[in-house]
Every structure is written in C-alpha cells, then in structure tokens.
Regions:
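Active-site/ligand-binding neighborhood in enzyme catalytic cores
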Residues: 116-119, 139-143, 156-284, 302, ...
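Conserved flavin/dinucleotide-binding core of flavoenzymes
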Residues: 132-134, 371-374, 387-515
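Mid-domain catalytic core of redox enzymes
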Residues: 56, 108, 281-291, 302-409, ...
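Dinucleotide-binding Rossmann-like beta1-alpha1 core, especially the glycine-rich loop
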Residues: 79-168
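N-terminal Rossmann-like FAD-binding beta1-loop-alpha1 element of flavoenzymes
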Residues: 35-62
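Intrinsic disorder/low-complexity segments
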Residues: 1-33, 288-309
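Conserved Rossmann-like nucleotide-cofactor binding loop
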Residues: 45, 68, 331
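Glycine-rich FAD pyrophosphate-binding loop
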Residues: 54-78
C-alpha cells in the first residue's frame, strides 16, 4: 500500500546496481550457445528476468513455490469489483513498470490515480484529519496549510517553520528515520507523519528503518541545503524551469484497468513456450554429488556450485545451471544458498521481514450516510488500533468499483501487530469491520469480504542496511553466475523489482554458456 511518493532509491552498486538506462539497451541477438538459466521465484522480479531473457532469445526455468505466478501481485474480481490482494498500483516517477507494460502491449489499459480527489487522512484523538496540502512525505512546502492543520500542535508548527533556517550538517553513518525527522521537525512529526506514512509503505517502524535506504533523497537534501523544506522547494523550482510542456502533472500512481494481475498474465503469455515453470516449495540445502534427472514438480531444496555452475535440488534430484537468479525472499535465499557461500547466506538471513494482511470489505453505497472522502486514511500507532490504513478503492481509481458499491481495502499487521496473521478470518473480519465503522463513522455491514495474508513478505530496510548490502555485493562478486533480485535490496516497489530483474537478464545475456 502506498499513499505518497518516497523518492527515487539510490542506484545500487556492483551486482545489485540499477541500470541508469531507461530501457533495455543491449544488443539482444542471442549468443551461441546460450547459458542454462534457472530463476528461483516467480514473482514480478523473477518474471521480469525471465521476460527479458526470452526477449533476448534465451530460455530459462522458473522454480516457484506457489501454485501461481505473480508473488504478492494478485487480482480478483468479486461482484464487479477489481480487488487487489497485494499492491494496487506503482509510482509513475519510476519508469521500469511503464516500460514493461508498453512492451507487453498494455498501454491502453493504463489508468492514473484520481489525484484531484487525493486527500489522505490521519486519525488523531478519535478524529480523521487531512494531511496538510503541499506535504512531501513529512516535508511541508506550503505555509498556510501547515499553520491551519489540526494534525500538529503549535510548537511543532513553529519548529517546522524554523527548520528553513537550518545550515548544512555533515551526517556520518546511517541513522533511523525517526532520529532524522525528529532532528528536523520534532517528535510529533515522527508520531503523526513519519510513523503512519512508513507503516503504510513498509509495514515498519521509523525508529528501526534506515533513513539512508528509505529516504535517500532527503538525506542528500539535508547534506546540501541543511533544511529539508528549503531543499524540496529548490528542487521543485528547478523542475519547473525545465518543464516547458505546460501540461497537467502526471498522476502520482498508475495501475491497469483490470488490475495488476493483467501484467502478470501478459508476461506469462509472452514467455509461454520459451520459459519452463516448475512449482514446489523452496526448502533447505542438501549437499550431494552430481545427480541425474528431475521430477516435474517438487520443492527446490537447495543450490550448490557444480564446478563453475550451479546445481539446484528439487525433490531429491538435481538440475544444473550456468546462471542462477535468486528472486525469492531473502530469508528463503539464505536457506537455499548456504551450500554456495555460507557468509552470503548469513547476510541474507539478517534482512528482517514483516507480515501484512489485506482485508477487502464491499458495502452497499446506499448504507453510507455520505460517500467516502479522499483516497483513505492512516492510523498512527499512538491511536492503539489494529487497522494500519484503509483505501477507498473507488475514489482512488476509476473503473475499479461499480456504481452502488463502496469498496474498502484495509491493512493490518506490520511490525506493530505481527500476531494478527495467526487469528482466524472470522476474528479479523469482525475487528476490521468494527474499527472501520468506528473510524469512518458508519454502521453498514459488508456485503462481501476477502482476506489475504502475506507472511514475511515485506522486507525491512533497517538501520545498517547500506552496510549489509555492501557486504552482500562483495560476496556476490566472488560467485560468477549468481544474481539476486527482489524487494530486499534496493527498492520495495514494483518498478524497483522489475528493474532488478531486467538488469539480471542484461548481465546473463552477455555471458556465453560454459563449455
């Protein structure tokens, strides 16, 4: 779930480095012979790698633990509503997703968020209060909305105004988002801006998240300008001077009319006949010698180097690969790679994850005293509620909800309530409905419901994440043919994952097969 732009992530280094090129620029004429490629993980990262490999003339095999492709991207149609089980959109500012969608022939299916209706509320003291207009994450850029908001106290407003006077300051090392924002704007800005916003995006706590990894743009602005507000305003002025189109701004978010599942289906259709997909749950490594044959389906139990290549164990048998892309969660990669590089496996195992839950509640619009206002609301931890956030789907995107229906997507879990995933669907639905009624002020009962659980699916970029990545990259540099992709490294969004899969494919297409 994303309500606001968090800025462009830092370019990765070494094997995790993001390509600065906006599209695949390599000569895709296939080398002869092509390397044998195995991709572990059939989410958007692994599928993107497979798509660009197939585009370059290479075949590969995807090993996916779930019975379907797409990972956390999953779309359902219920009573005319388009329901996203996971992410519902992607940031327009990051181009990789739109580039892939264009290549898949889905450009006419792209829709933008209804930004003229984009109001995000924050619950405080039992009331829903809109975020001040002009807020860029936690950075105020307009004085009047800041002065008139009921979300912040006068002492915090004064402090945020005086932040304009801050001088540049050298910041050695990494620190938490909470420390960084509190130094600039005070503790209340952490509690009612940073915490609810980052809980909605990362499912994590600002006291644990790395500011260097999560808000790299703000770190750069603080280093250059001292004041975040002054830095954001200066960047906006530069952008306006370069933009001579005079047209309306791009929508903050984009998606597909029929849901993001359209993209997964289109990739699967595009690679059919070129990419083999095998299903089975990834498990622990079992070192063994060279083995022959492979069952059609079974759990991928581990990988180990085989000379200069890799052997991947599935259901007691082994398959070989010259190039291996590990595009599953880092904790799964840790188990799989223990026989390849123990230190790399240990590092991957230190990437924390949080769990999340999406609850879709469909209501009769006639049961509401008034139509829902804005994109939705955020619930800070201080409010002591189980709901983390809620999106009014029909307001955020057109074509998603038929007339006469109100669809709410509620979010629970994260680091503040990991135990929620252990509760029954009935208990979760009762709690989510009751809190939604209380917070939004209505008594309607849902006409239909859906519950989606995502255990250990949201990577946490905790303090020290840049140092961890540097060591991961150092280990990767000593293992030719091994690539990592996914949301555990240099960006959690759909465009970030697509970019990493594409870059892995670019590297593999440049490598001939081993003789």
């Amino acid at each position: 779930m994303v309500f606001v732009w968090v800025g462009q992530a830092r370019p990765p280094a070494n094997r995790l480095r993001s390509s600065a090129r906006p599209a695949l620029k390599l000569d895709l004429t296939p080398l002869t012979p092509m390397p044998k490629v195995v991709i572990i993980g059939g989410g958007i990262s692994g599928l993107s790698a497979a798509y660009y490999l197939a585009k370059g003339g290479a075949s590969c095999t995807i090993l996916e633990s779930r019975p379907r492709l797409g990972g956390v991207i999953q779309t359902e149609r219920v009573e005319g509503c388009t329901i996203e089980a996971g992410p519902d959109s992607f940031l327009s500012a990051k181009p990789a997703a739109l580039e892939l969608i264009r290549e898949l022939g889905l450009s006419d299916q792209v829709i933008g968020s209804n930004d003229h209706l984009r109001i995000t509320y924050v619950r405080k003291g039992g009331r829903l209060i809109p975020l001040p207009d002009g807020l860029m994450m936690m950075v105020p850029t307009r004085i009047l909305p800041l002065l008139t908001t009921g979300l912040l106290s006068w002492s915090t407003k004064v402090r945020m105004g005086l932040e304009l006077l801050r001088a540049p300051k050298l910041r050695p090392g990494d620190e938490s988002v909470a420390e960084f924002i509190e130094e600039h704007y005070g503790p209340e800005a952490v509690d009612y801006l940073a915490e609810p916003l980052l809980s909605g995006i990362y499912g994590g706590s600002p006291s644990e998240l790395s500011v260097t990894s999560v808000l790299p743009r703000f770190v750069d602005l603080a280093r250059q300008y001292g004041s975040l507000t002054r830095g954001v305003l200066a960047q906006r002025a530069k952008a306006r001077s370069k933009d001579r189109t005079g047209g309306p701004p791009e929508p903050l978010f984009r998606t597909l009319k029929g849901g993001l599942g359209q993209m997964i289906d289109a990739i699967a259709s595009s690679i059919r006949g070129k990419v083999e997909v095998r299903h089975g749950r990834a498990q622990a490594v079992e070192p063994s010698g060279r083995a022959q044959g492979l069952e059609r389906n079974g759990p991928a139990q581990g990988v180990e180097p085989g000379g200069q290549a890799f052997r991947i164990r599935m259901d007691g048998d082994w398959m070989e690969a010259d190039q291996l892309v590990v595009a599953c969660e880092a904790h799964s990669g840790s188990r799989l790679l223990a026989g390849v590089d123990r230190r790399l496996a240990e590092l991957l195992g230190t990437v924390p994850y949080s769990s999340s839950m999406t609850v879709a509640l469909g209501f009769n619009a006639a049961d509401f005293p008034r139509p829902p206002d804005g994109f939705g609301f955020l619930v800070p931890k201080k409010e002591r509620r189980r709901l983390v956030a809620c999106t009014w789907v029909g307001t955020k995107f057109s074509h998603r909800v038929p007339e006469g229906t109100v669809l709410a997507r509620c979010f629970l879990g994260g680091t503040q309530d990991a135990a929620v995933l252990q509760e029954s669907d009935e208990a979760i639905l009762a709690a989510a409905t009751a809190e939604l009624q209380e917070i939004a002020g209505f008594r309607a009962q849902p006409r239909f419901t859906r519950v989606f659980r995502w255990p250990c699916s949201m990577a946490q970029y905790t303090v020290g994440h840049p140092q961890r990545l540097a060591e991961i990259e150092a280990r990767l540099s000593s293992i030719p043919g091994l690539h990592l992709a996914g949301n555990a490294y240099r960006g959690i969004g759909i465009p970030d994952c697509i970019r990493m899969g594409r870059v892995a494919a670019e590297r593999m297409l440049a490598v001939p097969a081993k003789s």
